[in-house]
């Protein structure tokens, strides 16, 4: 019954997913919300929830426009379900904000296949990834995805390869200016850069282990179908699928680090 209900794409499906995401968002944050019921706190939680919904909407748009899945609403359904089994993904504001900017960056990279406004898209993608790293440092690893995209879409002009670094320099200037105006000091790289740590003690929680195990099992299972589908696609469509696959590998690397 659920399968037949979500096998098409309708606005009502997004409404249902929005309501369900609101429920699990409030459920996992109930202790924080009840601890401080001031207007400022409630507005902050609601603003972060809007960030979550905006991320889901962009992801749905990205998948639909590039035909990354069949015409159905299962992509957003599974996204919210996976968020629901990893509580920390909904509790940490920085992770939600970083995720939004990474999704925006991936959207710009996938759109490179049109070969229109290439320089602007490369700049935007690098800039969004840089902003994401301000909230969660290891999001900077997605910067590598830009060069994967340039190779996939055969973007070979030397100037284009400089643009992503230019975007980071612009972001650094903006961050430094903000620090000087607000904190009366230069941008603190020591507090920004995190060291590599393979300490997995944070994953010792039983519920977290179960959630991650479910996601990994599902990912491995779906990869067989995904890779098979890539081989059957024409080149122009195949590149988008391969790019998403690279993004998946980078995401797993971030989880380990």
Each model region followed by its residue ranges:
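Perimembrane helix-loop-helix junctions
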Residues: 142-166
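Transmembrane-helix motifs of polytopic, lipid-linked glycan transferases
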Residues: 50-66
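Membrane-interface alpha helices of multi-pass inner-membrane proteins
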Residues: 123-137
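Juxtamembrane membrane-water interface segments that cap and precede transmembrane helices
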Residues: 29-39, 188-209
């Amino acid at each position: 019954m659920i399968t037949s209900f979500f096998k098409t794409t309708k606005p009502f499906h997004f409404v249902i997913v929005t309501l369900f995401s609101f429920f699990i968002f409030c459920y996992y944050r109930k202790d924080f919300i009840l601890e401080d019921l001031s207007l400022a706190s409630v507005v902050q939680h609601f603003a972060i929830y809007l960030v979550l919904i905006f991320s889901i909407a962009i992801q749905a748009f990205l998948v639909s426009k590039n035909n990354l899945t069949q015409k159905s609403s299962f992509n957003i359904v599974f996204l919210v379900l996976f968020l629901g089994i990893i509580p920390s993904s909904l509790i940490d504001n920085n992770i939600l904000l970083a995720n939004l900017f990474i999704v925006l960056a991936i959207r710009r990279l996938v759109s490179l296949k049109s070969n229109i406004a290439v320089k602007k898209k490369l700049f935007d993608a690098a800039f969004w990834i840089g902003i994401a790293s301000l909230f969660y440092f290891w999001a900077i690893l997605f910067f590598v995805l830009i060069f994967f995209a340039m190779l996939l879409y055969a973007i070979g002009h030397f100037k284009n390869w400089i643009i992503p670094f230019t975007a980071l320099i612009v972001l650094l200037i903006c961050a430094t200016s903000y620090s000087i105006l607000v904190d009366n000091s230069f941008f603190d790289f020591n507090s920004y850069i995190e060291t590599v740590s393979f300490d997995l003690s944070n994953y010792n929680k039983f519920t977290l282990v179960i959630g991650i195990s479910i996601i990994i099992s599902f990912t491995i299972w779906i990869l067989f179908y995904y890779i098979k589908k890539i081989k059957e696609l024409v080149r122009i469509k195949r590149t988008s699928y391969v790019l998403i696959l690279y993004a998946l590998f980078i995401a797993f690397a971030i989880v380990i680090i």
